[in-house]
Amino acid sequence: HGDFGGNTQQKDSSFTTNYFHLFPTIALQYGLTSEHLFQLSYGRRITRPNYGDLNPFTYIFDDYTHEGGNTKLHPSFSDNIELGYVYRDWFQTVLFFSHTDDAIMKSYREQEGRRIYVMPQNLSSYVQTGMRVHAANLSPVSFWKVNLTAIGIYNNYGWTEQGQKMKNRMFTPIFGCMNQFAFTSVWSAELSANYNGRMAYGQATVHPALEVNVGIQKKMFRNRCTVTLFAKDVFNTNYQKVDIQSPGVQAFVDERHNKRVLGIAFAWRFQKGSETKESRRKKEIDETKRVNL
């Protein structure tokens, strides 16, 4: 249940929205054998506009870009279905489908010549379907463990702009790889890479992005001390590049901030976990003796 009310500081601009809906969730699981497990789930969800989406005031970023909220936004409702298969707890594949009515996305409109006004609006439909595959704890050699994730997503957005029916649909590949290396009992390292392909996002098209992270760790003083040296976005390839096209509007965003981070972390453990567990166990035994159990 939801209830919105407010005033946009303009005469005769009061607004009220009331709604009542049910949001069921169903999850089923079937074990064919001890190694093969099938899962099926369905859920209906609501996404409400946040404060910034409803704020009627305009923010001026520069001479070419203004952004504001939209007091006429409605909540969006989505139906989500997933069918999954799990093999021996290390391999999982999932087929998913989602249909959203009144999806809340940013819209881009031309105002007064070359100025772009950005505001959220409800798109008439948004359909997402795809497949997700995950393999965990693969071990090519004794000191090397790998987690792999591959996702294929097809996004299909539909809306009406200036009387024209518009669509933005695209297939997007997503890959993730996490490598863990245990060279010795005290030396270890991690290497991860994540890639997002070209993606449809409302009226916008987001360009591919890649991020590579690396870290190395050393344990010292009988494993009480841990020193970690790490680097994020090693090749500085995780930047935002977006194309926007709609009737009367063609815009390009290319933000290339340097997101590379090099850091060092130091951790000291003052008491071993095994000693803590043993102390807790001793207290439990003493308490049992005290009450004569």
Language model regions located:
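Surface-exposed extracellular loop regions of Gram-negative outer-membrane beta-barrel proteins
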Residues: 1-15, 19-25, 143-154, 174-198
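Transmembrane beta-strands of outer-membrane beta-barrel pores
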Residues: 1-4, 42-48, 57-58, 89, ...
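Outer-membrane beta-barrel signature, preferentially recognizing the C-terminal barrel domain
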Residues: 17, 46-95, 99, 119-129, ...
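Outer-membrane beta-barrel strand-turn architecture
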Residues: 22, 30-34, 77, 87-89, ...
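Transmembrane beta-strands of outer-membrane beta-barrel proteins
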Residues: 24, 38-40, 91-95, 131, ...
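Residues on the lipid-exposed face of transmembrane beta-strands in outer-membrane beta-barrel proteins
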Residues: 26-30, 81-87, 131-137, 152, ...
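Outer membrane beta-barrel strand-and-loop segments of large Gram-negative receptors
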Residues: 74, 80, 93-149, 158-176
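Conserved C-terminal beta-signal and adjacent last beta-strands/turns
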Residues: 170-293
